[in-house]
Amino acid sequence: MKNYILIIISFFLITCDTIEPPYLQSNNQSSQKIVLIEKFTGHKCSNCPDATRKIKELQELYQDAIIPISIHPGGLKEFTDTDDNYIYDFTTNSSDVIASDMGASFLPLGTVNRIDGGISNRCFTKDQWASEIEKLLYDSEGLPRPKKFNIDISTVFNTTKKELTIETNIIALSDVKNNFNLVIIIIEDGIIAPQIDGTEFIESYEHNNIYRCAVNGTYGENISNSNGLENQFEYQSINTLILNQDANHNWTSDWDNINNCYVVAYVYETESLIIQDSVKKAIIDE
């Protein structure tokens, strides 16, 4: 018997360039469907940290398949207003509109891809989130539901000007009917400020996933017409934002927390308001 040995030798030439600011970042795509949770919360809401702990449990279970956003509704001032003990203002005009439109009549509550149901319009209690997430991620046979859209985000951040340019590219992965919008927002982690937790006042509580601003409007921009989209339809959106007090009143000249900020983009069907697919990426990857 003769043995034949085929040896294939490949040579790769790798060159390294020095990259200076501004920095370009892009998110990695996966085939996994992602669910967006809008958690309505408040720093004066004694039960809200329980909802935050529930979010952490769900993240341990579903990993990157969920994206949580924390919204402090300005309309529920008894939970979100500022005073001598709670000096940090987490509210924004855009998030106030969302909280009102979604039916956040008390706290804590949360939407799950903005599907209908729950106890208040589209709002569910924290103990209802898991079952709704499960139904959105998996079909009745336990198979993963396919994504409808591929959303890719690239960012360029100029550290000197605090200028952020976001390029968002969308591809429809199948023929889809109806009308769709793209929403782009900024969220921020690692904000240390007071929070009531049960009966305990915590002066140095870490607030994460905080809704900071809407980049392209509260309800975004249209990417289609009423006739829907064909498979492999492509759409590109480029937006530039200065991270200063015009974008969010907390982004003062001495603010320096860009390493804890993220871009979240999602596509929703305009008639039902139901979110189809979402993605999140750090503005500056470490």
Label each residue range with its predicted role.
Residues 70-286:
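Short, conserved sequence motifs used for protein processing/export or organelle targeting and
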Residues 40-51, 68:
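The canonical Cys-X-X-Cys-His
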Residues 47-63:
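Typically the conserved alpha-helix immediately C-terminal to a functionally engaged Cys/Sec
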Residues 31, 60-62, 100-101:
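A general structural signal for stabilizing positions within well-ordered secondary structure
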Residues 11-40, 46, 286:
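Bacterial Sec-dependent N-terminal signal peptides
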Residues 1-14:
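Sec-dependent bacterial lipoprotein signal peptides
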Residues 32-35, 63-67, 106-107:
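Loop/turn elements at helix/coil->beta-strand transitions in domains of secreted/extracellular proteins
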